[in-house]
Regions:
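Short, surface-exposed, charged loop/turn segments at secondary-structure junctions
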Residues: 175-182, 234-236
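Extracytoplasmic/periplasmic, Sec-exported soluble proteins
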Residues: 38, 78-82, 134, 138, ...
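Active-site rim elements
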Residues: 73-76, 186-195, 206-207, 237-241, ...
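A long, amphipathic alpha-helix that forms part
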Residues: 2-11, 144-151, 179-221, 253
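Active-site-proximal alpha/beta segments of enzymes that process anionic O-linked groups
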Residues: 1-23, 27-178, 249, 271, ...
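DG-centered beta-turn motif at the end of beta-strands
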Residues: 24-28, 220-225
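Histidine-centered active-site microenvironments of extracellular/periplasmic hydrolases
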Residues: 37-41, 210, 214-215, 221-257
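C-terminal, low-complexity/hydrophilic appendages and adjacent surface loops
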Residues: 244, 313-323
């Protein structure tokens, strides 16, 4: 449990929508997502959805722990303040908060993220052990929990966070060894399928949100990308790395209950500035959060080119090769 209280003192906000649903994906490379230019047709729902697509969004780090702690928490210099996170910010602003996770709560690398999750008013972790166990745990198991969250305390404005297993290696565990598109390497074929499964999951999230009859906004991003091992061979697979752009290039989009057309934000956006993006999404202002640039637009914002490597160093994303 996080013992230090948050320092947030935001304006009270009811946001523009009744229910805000933040879906945190796992290990999805942007170039494997059809809606973001991937060549494999694996996102039929998102392809036709009137979403705001961010096609130059980069993750904060190359792994779940590095990425999400630096995405979801306030940073002062090189110091992370886990108590000052998106959940506690939303709570202080008047939202009822939920954290529903299909990732672990007890593994070494899970712990900082689960601490953030446990700061919600309601939290539930489907996997009681570590996220790195090799057991099948479909993300669809989160849907009944989401249904409960949406329909409990209907008078409350809510932030509901869904943390997926998504495309976490090994991908064939995620898909139960099934795939539709055979690219000659089984793990890569499963990886393509795992992204299609996330697309199907997201369509069901939207369906549940619609069933409430209330307004909603859904934001999705993947925590990080992956890199190739044995590329272009039958034994090719994708795993964590920090040496290429593809380790950080991830899908990010927002869709609302009143969205009518697809929009594209081409300007670079970094997850290191996610606290600003998040606060603007929920219509929250706080003196501790920079707000000079409109992240939810095509405004040219500065310093959107940095990421963190495995050693905790800040590096320039554009200096990395693309492989």
């Amino acid at each position: 449990m996080i013992k230090s209280k948050s320092i947030w003192s935001p304006n009270k906000s009811r946001g523009e929508y009744k229910n805000y649903i933040l879906v945190i994906g796992e290990s999805a490379r942007r170039d494997y997502v059809h809606s973001f230019g991937g060549k494999y047709s694996n996102t039929p729902w998102l392809d036709s959805a009137p979403a705001m697509i961010f096609d130059n969004y980069i993750s904060a780090g190359p792994s779940t722990m590095i990425s999400l702690t630096n995405t979801l928490s306030l940073r002062k210099g090189s110091v992370l303040e886990l108590n000052n996170n998106v959940v506690t910010l939303a709570s202080k602003a008047g939202f009822e908060t939920w954290w529903l996770s299909n990732q672990g709560s007890k593994g070494h690398f899970d712990s900082p993220i689960s601490l953030i999750g446990h700061s919600a008013d309601y939290s539930e972790f489907i996997k009681s052990g570590s996220s790195d166990d090799r057991l099948i745990s479909p993300d669809e198991n989160l849907l009944p929990l989401l249904d409960v969250a949406l329909n409990k305390n209907k008078n409350e404005n809510k932030l509901i966070v869904l943390h997926l297993m998504g495309s976490h290696p090994k991908a064939c565990i995620r898909t139960n060894n099934t795939y539709d598109i055979d690219v000659g390497a089984k793990e890569v074929s499963c990886y393509i399928k795992s992204i299609e499964m996330t697309d199907q999951f997201l369509s069901k999230v939207i369906s549940l949100a619609n069933q409430t009859g209330e307004s909603w906004s859904v934001m999705y991003f993947s925590d990080h990308g992956l890199s190739y091992v044995n590329k272009d061979t039958q034994g090719a697979y994708l795993t964590h790395g920090d040496k290429t752009k593809e380790n950080y290039e991830v899908p990010f989009f927002i869709i609302n209950s009143n969205s009518e057309i697809k929009e594209v934000v081409h300007q670079p956006r970094s997850a290191l500035d996610f606290m600003t993006t998040f606060s603007q999404w929920l219509k929250i202002s706080d003196r501790n959060i920079p707000s000079a640039c409109n992240m939810l637009s095509n405004e040219n914002c500065s310093n959107e080119d940095y990421v963190i490597d495995f050693n905790g160093n800040y590096i320039k994303f554009n200096d990395l090769p693309s492989v």
